[in-house]
A protein has these predicted regions:
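A short, flexible loop at the N-terminus of ABC-type nucleotide-binding domains that lies
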Residues: 1-31, 40, 55-57, 256-282
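Pre-NBD coupling/linker segments of ABC/ABC-like ATPases
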Residues: 1-4, 8-9, 18, 90-124, ...
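The feature captures the beta-strand-to-loop junction immediately N-terminal to the Walker
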Residues: 36-38, 296-298
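ABC ATPase nucleotide-binding domain signature region
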Residues: 44-118, 307-315
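Conserved ABC ATPase signature
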Residues: 139-147
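Hydrophobic anchor residue at the start of the ABC signature
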Residues: 152-153
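Catalytic Walker B motif of ABC-type/P-loop ATPase nucleotide-binding domains
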Residues: 164-168
């Protein structure tokens, strides 16, 4: 099988960007890989090596994109990193811009930010999968986190890369939107020759279309194994992570002195609207001292908006 990306005993030239052991990893044609490890394990350093971000000592990364019209690594590998619900779509965007209408002047709509398509048929496939037609006239700052994820993927994939690397693709998405994104990625790889590499912190996030897993821990790249072998080797997680005694001690921790109010949060007929869209309408909400709440809702339902009010992060 042809390897599209291959590194043997790779060591970054700069000490700050080195893994703790030389990296040997090959990704074959048709493989879809998950790089899995805890935060700080070295996953991003490994990806930086695979995309040729930093020069290596002696051995370099070898690429084989024989079926591509371009031989450039930058044309064949695209990398998207997501930090939170709103990712990195635009460096000038900030969450409260939604509420400052004067700051929205000149904010582009989705259609303005999509590049020229190299392949019109592929563009139609993408637009159909991601439902982009309905978003084209929508300002970027009005997209929900799920919609923004679709926009970012479409913008990147219009360049027709051979490999798409996504770092933290499911961060900030609710369960339904995570499942939708996994389904869209599966349909995408079934309809095209695209290969996907996902960088994940939790093994629970690995989609079933992944063929192989590369575990990373303590800045060491583990051996690539099949998804089945990786899942079989996972330790069994106990039903309870804390004993009842420890849970009780945590719940019985005293409040700080001075917290005497019975009402911690009190909202009375709160409404928030931007443009023609109403996010919160005449909301009454009281949180009493000692209560523990969970906010639940789909992406775009208004959870972050409500929390911004509670945290006084609003104009």
């Amino acid at each position: 099988m042809r390897n599209i990306i291959c590194v043997q005993n790779g060591v970054a030239r700069h000490p700050d960007y080195r893994m703790n052991e030389p990296v040997s990893l090959a990704i074959g044609e048709g493989e879809h890989v998950a790089i899995v490890g805890r935060n700080g394990a070295g996953k991003s350093l490994l990806v930086d090596m695979l995309i040729g971000k930093y020069p290596l000592l002696m051995n370099e990364v070898h690429y084989d994109f024989a079926s591509s019209v371009s031989s450039l690594v930058s044309d064949n590998i695209k990398y998207i990193s997501f930090r939170d619900s709103y990712g990195e779509a635009d460096g000038t965007y900030y969450y409260q811009q939604r509420w400052h209408s004067h700051d929205r002047e000149g904010i582009p709509v989705v259609a303005d930010l999509l590049p020229e398509a190299k392949d019109e048929e592929f563009k139609r496939t993408l637009f159909g999968l991601f439902g982009m037609e309905a978003l084209l006239d929508k300002p970027l700052i009005l997209l929900s986190s799920g919609e923004l994820r679709k926009f970012q993927l479409t913008r990147t994939l219009l360049a027709r890369p051979a490999v798409l690397i996504m770092d933290n693709p499911f961060i900030g998405l609710d369960a339904a939107t995570r499942d939708l994104l996994k389904s869209l990625l599966r349909q995408l790889i079934e309809a095209t020759s695209l290969q996907v590499i996902l960088v994940l912190s939790k093994s629970d996030d690995i989609p079933d279309f992944i063929t192989h897993v590369v575990p990373v821990a303590d800045r060491v790249c583990g051996a690539k194994v099949t998804l089945e072998a990786y899942l079989q080797a996972l330790p069994v997680v106990p039903d309870r992570l804390l004993s009842p005694e420890k849970e009780k001690r945590i719940l019985d921790l005293p409040y700080k002195e001075g917290m005497h109010s019975e009402q911690v949060v009190c909202l009375n007929r709160v409404s928030i609207r931007y443009g023609e869209r109403t996010i919160l309408k005449e909301l009454d909400w009281t949180v009493n001292r000692g209560e523990k709440w969970a906010l639940s809702g789909e992406n775009g339902a208004g959870k972050s908006t409500l929390l911004s009010l509670v945290c006084a992060d609003n104009p």
